[in-house]
Amino acid sequence: MSSQKQLEGMIFDVQSFSVHDGPGCRTTVFLNGCPLSCKWCANPESWTVRPHMMFSELSCQYENGCTVCHGKCKNGALSFNLDNKPVIDWNICKDCESFECVNSCYYNAFKLCAKPYTVDELVQVIKRDSNNWRSNGGVTFSGGEPLLQHEFLHEVLLKCHEVNIHTAIETSACVSNEVFNKIFNDIDFAFIDIKHMDREKHKEQTGVYNDLILENISNLANSDWNGRLVLRVPVISGFNDSDENISDIISFMHKNNLVEINLLPFHRLGESKWTQLGKEYEYSDKGDVDEGHLEELQDIFLDNGIACYVGHETAF
């Protein structure tokens, strides 16, 4: 009798020795798929669950006369200019399922940003790192939005807890109440993002309203869940750092007895990924958040009885 086929999940990265994604030294698993499309996103390759291609011009050897990818794309998405440089029609490329360009490239200039794992395969990768965690580490599921692949994630979480692996999640909480509650039954620690308290401004920069996000956070905070929750705010000057928005976050936290928040200053580390995906990065001219301003925001939270950590400074 054949065994039942295991669920597969799409993963775009697995990082060992992570020290900023929850208590202790951790393994962080990045799952594909996200309901948001934040204009500052550092991982835009994670937005879709299905595999898709990225192109790195810096890795491409077209200037040295390489032609191994010529004629490989049967869909007509790949052409070449007079300098032999690949030119990609992303509207055609986004529907590709064969990825001949990726398979032909010797230099990893074309690469896929999703890899399938079965439940057991991923759990084996996680367990492999367990000697690095010491006594207080574990696994953190990030993304993208890990809750989009909730069936796969649920099976992985169950197997992790079978062998007493501490589980954490980084999530936008932008999923149905049913999915959110089901997954959090097996979560020990959580970072949940709040991008903005105003629903219209939230939609303007992320593509979705924040009603479901705030509802899930509130429900979790008022449930019998016994894990640890830290809210996270990606601080972006001129978007969500106003006195009004900070005050609204504090009011929301007080209302729901939430006591910890992490302020993450905006950065442009993901800009090159947008280029590799053929996307325009609207935040290329956005400046860094002033350190003095971050300290002022931190003081406001502290003065209101909320533990506030800036950047990767956390109470682990």
Swiss-Prot record:
It is an enzyme of class 1 (oxidoreductase). Keywords: 4Fe-4S, Iron, Iron-sulfur, Metal-binding, Oxidoreductase, S-adenosyl-L-methionine. Residues 84-115 form the 4Fe-4S ferredoxin-type domain. Its EC number is 1.97.1.-. It catalyses: glycyl-[protein] + reduced [flavodoxin] + S-adenosyl-L-methionine = glycin-2-yl radical-[protein] + semiquinone [flavodoxin] + 5'-deoxyadenosine + L-methionine + H(+). [4Fe-4S] cluster 2 binds at C60, C66, C69, C105. InterPro entries: 4-hPhe_decarboxylase_activase, 4Fe4S_Fe-S-bd, Aldolase_TIM, BssD/PflA/YjjW, Organic_radical-activating, Organic_radical_activase, Radical_activat_CS, rSAM. Its cofactor is [4Fe-4S] cluster. GO terms for molecular function: 4 iron, 4 sulfur cluster binding; metal ion binding; oxidoreductase activity. Binds 2 [4Fe-4S] clusters. One cluster is coordinated with 3 cysteines and an exchangeable S-adenosyl-L-methionine. Gene3D superfamilies: Aldolase class I. It holds the Pfam family Fer4_12. Residues 20-307 form the Radical SAM core domain. PANTHER family: PYRUVATE FORMATE-LYASE 2-ACTIVATING ENZYME, PYRUVATE FORMATE-LYASE-ACTIVATING ENZYME. Catalyzes activation of 4-hydroxyphenylacetate decarboxylase under anaerobic conditions by generation of an organic free radical on a glycine residue, via a homolytic cleavage of S-adenosyl-L-methionine (SAM). Belongs to the organic radical-activating enzymes family. This is 4-hydroxyphenylacetate decarboxylase activating enzyme. It comes from Clostridioides difficile (strain 630).
